[in-house]
C-alpha cells in the first residue's frame, strides 16, 4: 500500500480557506495614474481608455473615486486583456500641463480615448458603477451593422445619416480603416457594411464608401479618396456626419454650451423642414467663414418653449431666428429676411462688434438714423440668456472659471 499524505484538521481548514478565497476573489483592476512621462504611451496603446481628470480637493472628484474604481473592476472581468479597456486618471493639480493640453475646465471630467485619439464627446452620464460599465460596453460594441441582403442596401433608414461601405472582404486594410472611423463617429452617423457577393453590384470600380443623407431627395455621395488613408477617410466622413447646422436637444445642450461659442438658432416646428432647409442653405452661403466663432443650431419649438418665452415668442410665431450670447438673447426679425443677401451675415457681425448689445441698451446707433430724423436715446434691456442654464452645473462639477461672455 502506497502511503498517503494526510493533512491535519487545522491545516486542511486553512487550505480550504485559501482555495475559496482564491476562487471567489474578484479581479482588481488598477487605475493607472497618468503623467507627462507615460500618458502618450498608455493612451496610444489602449483600444479604449476612460480618463478621470480630477482634483483631490474637489468633493465631486472624491465622490467619484470609489465608483470609478469599482466600474474598472467590473469591466476588467469582462475585458481582461491589458489594452482592451484602460481606466486611468490625471491629478490636475500635480499635472496642470496635461489639464491645459486637454482644456479641462471642470472637475471631474471624464474623457474617452480610442488608440490615443480623444473623442469629442466626454462622458456626461450618471456617476454610478452600472452606468459607467454600460457606457464602456457600448463603446466596445461593434459600431457597424453588417448587411446580408441587397434589399437592406437599397432601403436603409433615410431618417439618419448613413455611411455604407462596400468591401470585397472583411479582412482588408480598407475595412480596418473604415471600422476605425466608425468607432469614432458612430454617435453621429449610422455605419453599415456589405461584403463579398452581397456588395458585388456596388463594387464595379472596387471597394467604395457611399454617404446617403437624410431624406429621399438628396443624392448619394461617393468617397473618391484613398480608402487606406485614415486622415482622408475620417475627414470626408466627419464632414458628412457632423452637419454645419446641428440640432440642439436637452441631451446635448451641456456639451454644446461648453464649446463656449454663441448660438445662432433657428426655432422651428419639427415637421417644418422647409424653413430648416432655407436656414441651412443661407448659413452655408453667408456664414461658412464664421464656423469657428459661432455655433449654428436648430431647435424644436415645442421642446424649447421656455427660450421662446424669453424673447416674447411662442411656437405659433415659429420659425424664429435668434442669437444667444450666453448673456443675452437677440431676435433676428422677420424670418423671410434671411433670404436677403448678407442680412444674416450682418446680424452675426453685429453680435461680434458689440452693436447688438449696444443698441439694445442705448437705442439705434447714430449712423443707422435716417437724415433729419431726431435721435432718441431709447434704453432697453435685452432678454437674459436662456441656454446658459444648460451649461455644466455647479451641483455636479467644480467649475474652474467663468466664461467670458459677450
Swiss-Prot record:
CDD domains: PDI_a_ERp44 (cd02996), PDI_b'_ERp44 (cd03072), PDI_b_ERp44 (cd03070). Its main location: endoplasmic reticulum. GO terms for cellular component: endoplasmic reticulum lumen; endoplasmic reticulum membrane; endoplasmic reticulum-Golgi intermediate compartment. The keyword Disulfide bond applies. InterPro entries: ERP44, ERp44_PDI_b, Thioredoxin-like_sf, Thioredoxin_domain. GO terms for biological process: protein folding. Residues 1-29 form the signal peptide. Residues 236-285 are annotated as: Interaction with ITPR1. It holds the Pfam family Thioredoxin. It is found in: Endoplasmic reticulum lumen. Residues 30-138 form the Thioredoxin domain. Residues 360-387 are annotated as: Disordered. Gene3D superfamilies: Glutaredoxin (3.40.30.10). It comes from the Eukaryota. A motif (Prevents secretion from ER) lies at residues 403-406. Transmembrane segments: none annotated. Keywords: Chaperone, Disulfide bond, Endoplasmic reticulum, Signal. One of its GO terms (molecular function) is protein disulfide isomerase activity. Residues 378-387 have a biased composition (Polar residues). Disulfide bonds join 189-241, 301-318. Mediates thiol-dependent retention in the early secretory pathway, forming mixed disulfides with substrate proteins through its conserved CRFS motif. Inhibits the calcium channel activity of ITPR1. May have a role in the control of oxidative protein folding in the endoplasmic reticulum. Required to retain ERO1A and ERO1B in the endoplasmic reticulum. Forms mixed disulfides with both ERO1A and ERO1B and cargo folding intermediates; the interactions with ERO1A and ERO1B result in their retention in the endoplasmic reticulum. Directly interacts with ITPR1 in a pH-, redox state- and calcium-dependent manner, but not with ITPR2 or ITPR3. The strength of this interaction inversely correlates with calcium concentration. This is Endoplasmic reticulum resident protein 44. It comes from Bos taurus (Bovine).
Amino acid at each position: 500500500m502506497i502511503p498517503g499524505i494526510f493533512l491535519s484538521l487545522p491545516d486542511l481548514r486553512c487550505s480550504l480557506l485559501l482555495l475559496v478565497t482564491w476562487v471567489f476573489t474578484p479581479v482588481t483592476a488598477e487605475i493607472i495614474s497618468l503623467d507627462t512621462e507615460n500618458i502618450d504611451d498608455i493612451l496610444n496603446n489602449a483600444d479604449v481608455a476612460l480618463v478621470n481628470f480630477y482634483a483631490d480637493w474637489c468633493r465631486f472628484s472624491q465622490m467619484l473615486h470609489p465608483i470609478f474604481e469599482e466600474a474598472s473592476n467590473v469591466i476588467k472581468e469582462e475585458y481582461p486583456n491589458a489594452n482592451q479597456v484602460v481606466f486611468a486618471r490625471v491629478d490636475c493639480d500635480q499635472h496642470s500641463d496635461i489639464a491645459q493640453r486637454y482644456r479641462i475646465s471642470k472637475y471631474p471630467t471624464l474623457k474617452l480615448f480610442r488608440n490615443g485619439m480623444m473623442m469629442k464627446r466626454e462622458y456626461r452620464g450618471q456617476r454610478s458603477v452600472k452606468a459607467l460599465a454600460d457606457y464602456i460596453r457600448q463603446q466596445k460594441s461593434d459600431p457597424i451593422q453588417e448587411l446580408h441582403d441587397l434589399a437592406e442596401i437599397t432601403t436603409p433608414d433615410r431618417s439618419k445619416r448613413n455611411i455604407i461601405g462596400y468591401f470585397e472582404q472583411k479582412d482588408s486594410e480598407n475595412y480596418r480603416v473604415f471600422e476605425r472611423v466608425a468607432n469614432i463617429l458612430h454617435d453621429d452617423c449610422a455605419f453599415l457594411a456589405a461584403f463579398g457577393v452581397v456588395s458585388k453590384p456596388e463594387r464595379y470600380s472596387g471597394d467604395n464608401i457611399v454617404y446617403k443623407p437624410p431624406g429621399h431627395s438628396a443624392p448619394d455621395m461617393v468617397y473618391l479618396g484613398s480608402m487606406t488613408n485614415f486622415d482622408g477617410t475620417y475627414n470626408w466622413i466627419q464632414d458628412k456626419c457632423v452637419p454645419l447646422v446641428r440640432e440642439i436637444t436637452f441631451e446635448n445642450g451641456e456639451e454644446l454650451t461648453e464649446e463656449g461659442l454663441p448660438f445662432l438658432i433657428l426655432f422651428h416646428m419639427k415637421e417644418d423642414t422647409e424653413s430648416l432647409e432655407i436656414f441651412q442653405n443661407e448659413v452655408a452661403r453667408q456664414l461658412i467663414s464664421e464656423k469657428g466663432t459661432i455655433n449654428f443650431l436648430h431647435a424644436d419649438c415645442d421642446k424649447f418653449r421656455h427660450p421662446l418665452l424669453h424673447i416674447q415668442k411662442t411656437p405659433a410665431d415659429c420659425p424664429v431666428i435668434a442669437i444667444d450670447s450666453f448673456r443675452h438673447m437677440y431676435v433676428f426679425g422677420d424670418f423671410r429676411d434671411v433670404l436677403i443677401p448678407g442680412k444674416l451675415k450682418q446680424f452675426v457681425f453685429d453680435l461680434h462688434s458689440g452693436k447688438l448689445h449696444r443698441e439694445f441698451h442705448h437705442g439705434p446707433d447714430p449712423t443707422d438714423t435716417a437724415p433729419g430724423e431726431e435721435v432718441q436715446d431709447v434704453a432697453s434691456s435685452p432678454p437674459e440668456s436662456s441656454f446658459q442654464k444648460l451649461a455644466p452645473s455647479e451641483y455636479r462639477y467644480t467649475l474652474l472659471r467663468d466664461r467670458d461672455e459677450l
